[in-house]
Design a protein with these regions (language model features):
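His/Glu-based metal-binding/catalytic segments typifying zinc-dependent metallopeptidases
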Residues: 36-38, 45-47, 158, 162, ...
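Hydrophobic, small-residue-rich alpha-helical packing segments that form membrane-like cores
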Residues: 144-217, 221-239, 243-271, 276-278, ...
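Extended, regular secondary-structure scaffolds
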Residues: 207, 219, 228-246, 370, ...
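M16 family metallopeptidases and their MPP-like homologs
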Residues: 41-51, 77-125, 132-143, 170-195, ...
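Active-site His/Glu-centered metal-binding helix of metallohydrolases
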Residues: 58, 62-66, 574
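Generic recognition of flexible, low-complexity loop/linker segments
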Residues: 90, 206-210, 269-272, 315, ...
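Non-catalytic terminal extensions that flank enzyme cores
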Residues: 1-43
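Non-catalytic, conformational "gating/processing" segments within enzyme and secreted inhibitor domains
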Residues: 154, 206-238, 691, 696, ...
Length: 966
């Protein structure tokens, strides 16, 4: 290792098949951790301990701002330049309640070095000291377009946090943390409270950076297969050597334990047309020890699953049986110094508070006294051990997730970065404790005898959002009225100057400071598909031959093309309830235990694939994952789930419908962009209309009716479930997907044949499902403070064809045109677009303060494309960034899913290669030629917006109909 650092400790980490090193930089005291192994998806992170001292959101605003240009990379937005021209597998930055982290990842050596270089320069030498407009753009500013116009606030983080605070769940989480840890930095909002963000001054902003963004307060992490010495040398010679060690007081005292349980009451907004009945959130919250206790950290995760999260978990079941709220959720945040545990009753009556607490405490006391059934504990253990060992984090690199988890201990003890990663020994210790009453004692110590608890009640209040908006408007008006004529003119001028600086492009010289890898460094060929066809028991098998480390991934896919549209919502509901209702041989709690003990999970889902213009393939999928040795038990459980589930338990069905109802509400408020985009596409796309019926606003309205009129709807629901199951589970509909390499599909022959025997007899199939699209433009009013603005169309309906160049255009739009117009100038948190090879296409914004302005941006998008101009270097960057987004690393199970989808979409490797070749050869002229496609999409005039009721009312001319959705 480099001689500028001292190795504090070296240890083997078998869980990551590598060696961990704890180092300290001699000159500055910077903390460094290296995990060296053979993973080619390399990760770098630099983090800082950033405890907030108020609610202005300065840690969050700074996280955005340091990525807006630096000493060596002075262009306006190096982050965007990296996204556009990098093969990164991860590139982002995150603000937590007590730390700010800047991670990057890439499999390409040159690319990885560039990412590390840009990020180090950004955090240590940002342009914020010479460009005050960065704070205005990313944080907040006064916006005054003319002397007569109303004064408003704008800024990316300001609008992002308005969106966050529009979600009752997010609001509650923040109140809970503050209620328990009010005398620590956790009592403040690190992301920023929209009410307090405008209190942040430029001086406070710079002072925060000067104080905390110093090597002596830094946590640097390198992971993967790389020349570690080369990186340590670079980090020292380019950055750390220029600093001296500094005493930085970024630590804090723990919250003193309470002597008695506290109660907190707050309010959240609901729409003017909404009822306030049964909309109260009740929560029971406790501080759970210390995050440096590795055994407790993992042990309480297991306990939470046993008591609340597993199907049929006893304490949750007791609360559901008493009809406390529509759903019961638990959360365990162990990513802070003093972990916080919460039990939340969603949408309860406000008179149920005492009953909620009484049932909770009585059941906890009963379990602590009588003991936890050993099979329940064993199931929770197996669930977490499988999860930890499989280590499939989806699109997030393994090294990234391990690095983030490291901060859960490293931030509070320099010598303990690995304690939450080295889980094998902890699992062993915890297993030994099963018979010793350890878990029962956790209940006593932290949930019964612990006074460091709060009861937080959050009640609905009609018109509260309007009151907040009016208070903000009044405050701004009073401020404007207090200004002299000259001061008002100055504000108008400052607004113009900010807009002008946002319009101003970085110079060619600035842009060329970031090295770009060569096109030659990019793999030319697509990753191969693997669909080896065979048969078992007369059913087609698709074998995806990828190495899975002794785990078999099996999907039983059933074609639903013939299931009529009126049964589709019931089929969607069937997918939700399988595995969480009683069966012939098990209660749903027992079934959950068996699934966790014998497999890595069993689930049901619906999948819809767009196969051609106005054509789609719906599928009902049962899937499991297990060790090869457990395949018989896995199929026994699949049979139990598919053929023995009790679909007529009235009480249980109502509980599940209530849970789905609340979850769909959360989806509409927190990911409204997805709902708005799909709804806009459903006006013309049968594929999107079908998706609407199973997961969109249409499904929300269906579930709402089921819940509110449950007694009248019950018979229809049961009949619909049974009828859908009969039509789905037929042999003629079935295809098996198997991902694994260690065994051929023959290893499960007997199990498959036994499953087939349980299927319903094949019936004569009716005609293919028909979906009717209804052309409309809709505004959905909510009590939220921001908008999700969508428009959509199908360019193939206009006689235009798909080309891989559209993938490059998507990159250009997302990080050039839409980024500048919607995010930089408009202040929205996000903006995106997509163009499918079936023609369905959309534009949508995310946490957007605007509405009409965003539609104008879409209207002018085709002109931007027609006039598109970029030099060859920029074009190369767009191509590299596009390929990077196409080439994200995938686990074996994801490669199997990719092959499975390609098969049913009729895509060959040659088809995929053609698109890749079109991306790699894309020219400026190819982009300009796409203007008619963009024009066709926008001019199709399919609009949908989910947003603030007042904003929608002010812009109702954009819509044929305005509805109140929540």
């Amino acid at each position: 290792m480099n001689n500028k650092y001292t190795i504090i400790k070296q240890e083997s980490i078998e869980e990551l098949n590598g060696t961990g090193y704890i180092l300290k930089h001699d000159k500055t005291g910077a903390r460094v951790v290296v995990i060296s192994n053979e993973d080619d998806n390399k990760v770098f992170q630099i983090g800082f301990r950033t405890p907030p001292q108020d609610d202005t959101g300065v840690p969050h605003i700074l996280e955005h701002s340091v990525l807006c240009g630096s000493r060596e990379f002075p262009m306006k937005d190096p982050f965007v330049e990296l996204v556009k021209g990098s093969l990164n597998t991860f590139l982002n930055a995150m603000t937590y309640p007590d730390k700010t982290v800047y991670p990057v990842a890439s499999q390409n050596d040159k690319d990885f070095f560039n990412l590390v270089h840009v990020y180090l320069d950004a955090v240590f030498y940002p342009n914020i000291y010479k460009k005050p407009e960065i704070l205005k753009q990313e944080g907040w500013h006064y916006d005054l377009l003319s002397e007569d116009a109303p004064l408003t606030y704008n800024g990316v983080v300001f609008n992002e946090m308005k969106g966050v605070f529009s979600s009752p769940d997010q609001q509650l989480a923040r109140i809970i943390q503050k209620s328990l840890l009010e005398d620590t930095p956790y009592g403040f909002e690190s992301g920023g409270d929209p009410k307090a963000i405008p209190d942040l001054t430029y001086e406070m902003f710079l002072d925060f950076h000067k104080t905390y963004y110093h090597p002596s307060n830094s946590y640097i992490y390198l992971y993967g297969d790389m020349d570690v010495d080369e990186y340590l040398t670079f980090i020292d010679e380019h950055y750390l050597k220029d600093f001296d060690e500094k005493q930085i007081d970024s630590s804090w005292e723990k919250q003193e334990p309470f002597t008695e349980v506290k109660r907190v009451e707050e309010y959240y907004p609901v729409g003017e047309n909404d009822s306030e009945e049964e909309k109260t959130y009740l929560s029971y919250n406790a501080v759970i020890g210390d995050s440096l206790d590795a055994k407790l950290y993992l042990g309480f995760e297991i306990l939470n699953r046993v008591l609340f999260d597993a199907p049929g978990a006893p304490v949750k079941k007791a609360l559901m049986d008493a009809q406390i709220g529509k759903d019961i959720q638990s959360s365990y945040d162990n990513g802070i110094m003093q972990p916080v545990f919460s039990v939340i009753a969603q949408e309860a009556r406000d008179d149920q508070e005492d009953e909620f607490v009484k049932i909770l405490e009585e059941n906890l006391a009963k379990i602590a006294k009588e003991g936890i059934p050993r099979r329940n504990l064993l199931a929770a253990f197996n669930y977490y051990e499988f999860k930890y060992r499989e280590a499939n984090f989806g699109r997030f690199p393994k090294g990234l997730m391990y690095g983030l988890q490291m901060y859960d201990s490293w931030l509070y003890d320099d010598e303990k970065p690995f304690i939450h990663i080295k889980t094998n020994e902890i699992f062993k210790q915890l297993r030994e404790e099963i018979e010793n009453g350890y878990f029962e004692n956790l209940i006593k110590e932290y949930l019964i005898d612990n006074n460091h608890k709060t009861i937080v009640v959050m009640k609905p209040k009609k018109g509260l959002q309007k009151i907040k908006d009016q208070e903000e408007a009044d405050k701004l008006k009073a401020y404007k009225d207090s200004l002299s004529e000259e001061e008002v003119k100055k504000l108008v001028e400052e607004t113009k100057q900010l807009k002008a600086s946002q319009e101003e492009a970085s110079t060619k010289e600035e842009l060329e400071k970031i090295p770009v890898i060569d096109i030659e460094d990019i793999r030319k060929d697509v990753k191969p598909l693997s669909n080896v066809e065979s048969e078992l028991g007369g059913v087609k098998v698709l074998w995806h031959q990828y190495f899975t480390n002794k785990i078999a991934y099996v999907k039983l896919a059933f074609d639903m093309s013939h299931v009529p549209m009126d049964l589709v919502p019931y089929a969607s509901f069937l997918a939700e309830i399988l595995t969480i209702v009683d069966t012939t041989h098990y209660s749903y709690q027992e079934l959950g235990n068996e699934i966790s003990i014998e497999t890595g999970g069993i689930s049901a889902t619906m999948d819809v694939m767009p196969t051609d213009v106005h054509e789609f393939l719906p599928m009902f999928i049962l899937k499991t994952k297990c060790f090869y040795s457990n395949i018989k038990k896995a199929f026994d459980l699949l049979k139990e789930v598919a053929f023995e589930s009790k679909l007529d338990n009235k009480k249980r069905l109502k509980e599940i419908i209530g849970q789905i109802y609340t979850n769909l509400k959360i989806t509409l408020t927190e990911t409204g962009h997805k709902s708005a985009a799909n709804r806009a596409m459903s006006y013309f796309s049968e594929y999107a209309a079908y998706r609407e019926a199973i997961q969109g606003i249409t499904m929300y309205e269906t579930v709402k009716k089921w819940y509110e009129d449950f007694d009248e709807e019950y018979d229809n629901i049961v009949n619909g479930l049974k009828e859908a199951a009969k039509m789905i589970f037929e042999k003629q509909n079935m295809t098996i997907s198997y991902t694994g390499k260690e065994e051929t599909p023959e290893f499960m022959k007997a199990e498959v044949e036994s499953f087939i025997e349980g299927l319903y007899e094949d019936q004569k199939q009716g005609e293919k499902v028909k979906v009717t699209c209804t052309k409309s433009n809709e505004g959905f009013a909510t009590a939220g403070g921001v908008q999700y603005v969508a428009c959509a169309g199908n360019f193939k309906d206009a006689g235009l064809e798909y080309t891989g160049a559209l993938k490059v255009l998507q990159m250009i739009f997302s990080y050039e045109y839409l980024w500048i117009q919607i995010r930089v100038k408009g202040g929205a948190y996000g903006c995106m677009c997509s163009f499918s090879d079936q023609g369905d296409s959309m534009f949508v914004t995310y946490r957007d303060p605007n509405l009409s302005e965003s539609y104008k941006v879409y209207d002018e998008a085709a002109d931007y494309v027609a006039d598109f101009d970029a030099d060859d270097r920029d074009m190369k960057k767009y191509i590299i960034g596009t390929i990077g987004s196409m080439d994200m690393p995938m686990e074996a199970v994801d490669m199997g899913a990719r092959s499975f989808h390609a098969y049913f979409l009729g895509k060959t490797e040659a088809d995929l290669q053609k698109v890749r070749d079109q991306v790699l050869s894309c020219t400026q002229e190819d982009i300009r030629a796409l203007a008619p496609i963009v024009k066709a999409v926008v001019e199709a005039g399919n609009r949908c917006c989910i947003g603030n009721e007042e904003k929608i009312d002010q812009n109702k001319e954009y819509f044929d109909e305005v509805k109140h959705v929540l």
